[in-house]
Design a protein with these regions (language model features):
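Accessory beta-strand-rich segments of carbohydrate-active enzymes
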Residues: 1-62, 89, 263
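Extended acidic/polar, glycine-enriched regions
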Residues: 14, 87-91, 106-191
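Substrate-binding cleft of secreted/luminal carbohydrate-active enzymes
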Residues: 409-450
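Selected alpha-helical membrane-embedding segments in polytopic membrane proteins
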Residues: 517-520, 524-634
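Extracellular glycoside hydrolase catalytic/binding regions
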Residues: 322-426, 459-463
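Active-site-adjacent substrate/metal-binding segments within catalytic domains
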Residues: 28-30, 51, 55-68, 153, ...
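Hydrophobic alpha-helical transmembrane segments and adjacent short intramembrane/lumenal linkers
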Residues: 599-613, 619-730
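Aromatic-rich peripheral "rim/lid" segments of glycoside hydrolase catalytic domains that contact
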Residues: 437-495, 500-505
């Protein structure tokens, strides 16, 4: 949002005048953190996406205004101070367009002004100073205040959204009207205490919903009728507050919220920015600019009760604390409204002293996890209200027949949100809750959780579709909480996601290995000897005896498949976990590659095959690089030779197979997951020890050289990849953010 002054003396009367506005949509180091594509984020629209207005103003007009309120104890009366800033554009020459300003002393003028205040509902004149206008001497600009005392005021609230309107008239000395301006305002007071929120002195629960301003046909440039329809649909649901998100919406939305009585939390797009980035001076300056633009544009709306300075921040970090402190100080200078941020962290919050309250974004915990989270928040939020900033349930739009036991069904979304709201309504310690989300929206990154949907970059978390068609959840919530009639929900059956096919594959791998051992004598002997008599076996590799390349390839495939089975099960189990998606997306920013990965995660058998092939290729690449790196130490060997060493050193990895077959079930129990991790670590150490034995035997006199070379090759490969991802995408910085959040929620 911006304004540009075009002065009269640069316009050529009677001729064509062209005003060009050029917008630079390229991201630089300052803006990149604010537009980074993230799963479950929003689609970035660039260019001119809002209306452009050419406003004709007289040379003397109102440039800015604000209202300060001082209510009495029972909110029946209020002392009001209007502050107006008048601008004399005739004082500034055309050179100001190029950055300089010249005052024209002959244009110093005397003006007067008066205001009329009406109750919008009754259109009744409440206050005015028509009989005694105030007169001022204006040079380039002048600021003035006007005081009124109101009695028996009608307060603005969701139940009675009473608006007032003031009409300001600027007059000359001869009472000629120079300019007129009018705007709505309201008497509304919001406060936060340790036990919750108070609107006009009365305690209120924030029953909210998260609205992302987007439509499949219009992008972010929604027509006014759709904006109004959205607010009405929200009002009809019994919602009393909207969380925008996370970026300022069109001002017309707030006009409608003013009229319909829906409170608003509005925030800037500082979404999931890690401490290492958010603490930079240039990022703080850019965020401060966004905050100032938002507040200056929207601070006159009574519906807006709070400004958000950040979303899903790591509030345990000192650099985040510095960011929050700087933006909090900035906001306090601009406006007196409440300040907040959101975080996924349940504890260890170092920043909450600089805001009035915080939102906790939980995404989609099951009911038991939600209750546990509330208990944890009660323990650590003894002096501040608990507000859940984001909680919802995603659906597969095509799954209209499944019952509520199917977690991707439309019925389950209704059942889940109904239970969440019941807990919210029955627990006085929860002061606010925002359902996620009003309608489906499009993102820039395919989501793993949308793997069964036809459109993976459309996030189906809405209780309405993208086209504003109410889902079962909307109908259920409206019926339950507005009409007090309970709609019946069908339980259905729990879909089988046990992945028994992967267990069958594990048995097939095991049977295949047994057949090879039984039918091929040399293969069986090599397999047994590599495990029982590794020193003798590696002596045979030195002498090129008994080892055929096909045996090495087969044993390598079996070992790789044993690990691939475990990885595929792990990925499939966490396919709907938001933070798993975030961590994956920290390293995979290509939309095409992410789409392929999503397909593999949702098709574990194909995933096992791809992981197996990938591991074999990695082993082959290591062997190739190792062979040529050894030449630096005058050590001669073949690619096959090094390949044999690496593969047969890992024969013990076959024993991972039964654990990989059981991992899907063990992931549901933390203790079993720890055991599986210990088993993996054991076999990894076993592999390293066997590999060192092989190197020691094969390169007796060059052992240290070979060992160092192998470590260097591995370091260069892994370090090079890590350096690339970190320098290009800040992958590890973002992954660290998400891991810290997961740790906070699991403590």
């Amino acid at each position: 949002y911006f304004e540009i002054d075009v002065f009269e003396n640069v316009i050529k009367p009677g001729k064509e005048n062209i005003l060009e506005i050029e917008v630079d949509s390229n991201a630089d180091s300052n803006t990149a953190p604010f537009v980074r594509p993230l799963p479950l984020g929003w689609k970035q629209y660039t260019g001119i996406i809002r209306e452009i207005y050419l406003i004709l103003l007289p040379q003397i007009s109102i440039a800015d205004w604000k209202i300060d309120y001082n209510y009495n104890s029972d909110f029946t009366g209020c002392d009001v101070v209007f502050t107006f800033l008048f601008q004399n554009f005739n004082q500034v020459s055309s050179q100001s367009l190029s950055g300089t300003s010249e005052l024209k002393q002959e244009n110093i003028q005397e003006i007067g002004y008066f205001i009329e205040i009406y109750n919008v509902n009754t259109n009744k004149l409440v206050k005015d100073n028509i009989a005694s206008p105030k007169y001022l001497i204006i040079h380039q600009a002048v600021q003035d205040t006007l005081r009124f005392t109101f009695y028996n005021i009608q307060l603005w609230s969701p139940e009675t959204p009473t608006l007032y309107r003031f009409k300001l008239s600027i007059i000359g000395r001869n009472k000629t009207i120079i300019d007129r301006y009018q705007s709505a305002f309201a008497f509304r007071h919001i406060a936060v205490r340790s036990d919750g929120f108070y609107l006009n002195g009365q305690k209120i629960k924030l029953k909210g919903i998260h609205r992302i301003e987007q439509h499949p046909n219009y992008g972010i440039s929604l027509p006014y009728e759709i904006q109004k329809q959205d607010v009405k649909l929200i009002k009809d649901l019994g919602i009393n507050i909207i969380r925008t998100g996370p970026y300022p919406n069109h001002p017309y939305v707030y006009d409608i919220c003013d009229q319909m009585g829906i409170m608003v939390l509005e925030e800037i797009p500082t979404f999931q920015i890690p401490p290492e980035i958010i603490g930079r001076k240039e990022v703080i300056e850019h965020a401060s600019g966004l905050l100032q633009e938002m507040i200056n544009r929207d601070r006159r709306h009574p519906s807006i009760i709070g400004w958000g300075i950040g979303s899903e921040l790591n509030v345990s970090a000192q650099k985040t604390l510095h960011f929050v402190q700087q933006l909090s100080n900035k906001a306090r200078l601009l406006d007196k409204r409440l300040l907040y941020y959101s975080t996924n962290m349940l504890d260890d919050d170092n920043c909450n002293n600089f805001v009035d309250f915080r939102l906790i974004d939980l995404y989609s915990p099951d009911i038991a996890q939600f209750k546990n989270a509330i208990e944890a928040l009660i323990r650590v939020n003894l002096g501040s209200p608990i507000v859940i900033g984001r909680i919802g349930s995603s659906v597969v739009p095509e799954n209209a027949s499944g019952g509520y036991l199917d977690k991707t069904s439309l019925e389950h979304q209704a059942y889940y949100l109904g239970n969440i709201l019941n807990i919210f309504n029955s627990n006085d310690r929860i002061s606010g809750l925002f359902l996620w989300s009003f309608a489906d929206w499009q993102g820039a990154v395919p989501s793993i959780a949308e793997g069964r949907s036809l459109t993976q970059s459309t996030y189906h978390w809405g209780i309405l579709t993208e086209n504003r068609e109410p889902r079962r959840a909307y109908q259920y919530l409206k019926s339950t909480f507005i009409n007090n009639t309970m709609l019946a929900l069908t339980p259905g059956t729990i879909p089988d996601e046990s992945q028994g096919k992967l267990i069958y594959i594990g048995f097939l791998i095991f049977i295949f290995l047994l057949i090879l051992i039984k039918q091929h004598r040399w293969f069986g002997q090599n397999f047994r000897r590599s495990l029982i008599y590794p020193k003798i076996f590696f002596e045979d590799i030195i002498d090129n005896r008994n080892i055929q390349i096909w045996q090495t390839v087969v044993i390598g495939i079996i070992i790789s498949a044993s690990f691939g089975l475990g990885f595929a099960s792990f990925y499939f189990f966490y396919k709907r976990n938001v933070f798993f998606d975030y961590i994956i997306s920290s390293f995979i920013l290509s939309k095409t590659v992410k789409t392929i990965i999503i397909y593999l995660i949702w098709h574990p058998i194909a995933n096992v095959i791809v992981i197996t092939v990938s591991l074999m290729l990695i082993i082959g690449l290591l062997a190739f690089l190792q062979r040529y790196f050894l030449l630096l130490f005058n050590v001669q060997c073949t690619n096959t030779f090094v390949f044999n060493i690496i593969v047969w050193s890992g024969t013990s990895g076959i024993f991972v197979l039964p654990f990989s077959m059981a991992i899907y079930g063990s992931l549901q129990h933390t203790s079993l997951l720890i055991i599986y991790g210990v088993v993996l670590a054991f076999f990894l150490i076993w592999f390293i020890l066997r590999f060192l034995i092989a190197l020691r035997m094969l390169f007796r006199y060059n052992f240290l050289k070979v060992l160092v070379s192998f470590i260097v090759v591995c370091f260069l490969l892994s370090g090079g990849l890590a350096l690339f991802f970190q320098s290009a995408y800040k992958s590890f910085t973002y992954a660290k953010l998400y891991i810290s959040v997961v740790c906070s929620q699991t403590r």
